[in-house]
Amino acid sequence: MYKITQLSIFLENKRGNLYNTLDLLAANDINIRALSLADTTEFGILRLVVPDYKKAKEVLESKHYIVKETPVIGAVMDDIPGGIASILKILNDEDIDLEYLYAIAYGGTEKAGLLLHTGDLDELESVLLKHNIPLVPAEIIYNS
């Protein structure tokens, strides 16, 4: 219910690669709800959350992109200074080791969303709910 499928796309560090990838998705009417790009010397990892991840994966793989599906959890927080830190404090106090996180647009201007990934998503979900942190239902992502 709360696990959101993220696509990780491996991109060669080459001029125009990011544009070409995002243009391909746009040309196939695929909207991007969240995006993160991490790079190394030779390649980057583009992480995306889209409403129709199966279609996006199919489109990308048809053009020989390497695409991996990974579940993430979306947490909702107040859009104020310290919003992210308050969630990270809970995770730190509960000994949850995050692998990565990035932002997602959520709830207009008063709320913000944070996509989180860790080795044990069930534990992450349980801890967040125990501390009354609202989670982003996957249906909101997929039905938009």
Where are these regions (language model features)?
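A conserved regulatory-domain signal marking ACT and ACT-like small-molecule sensing domains
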Residues: 1-144
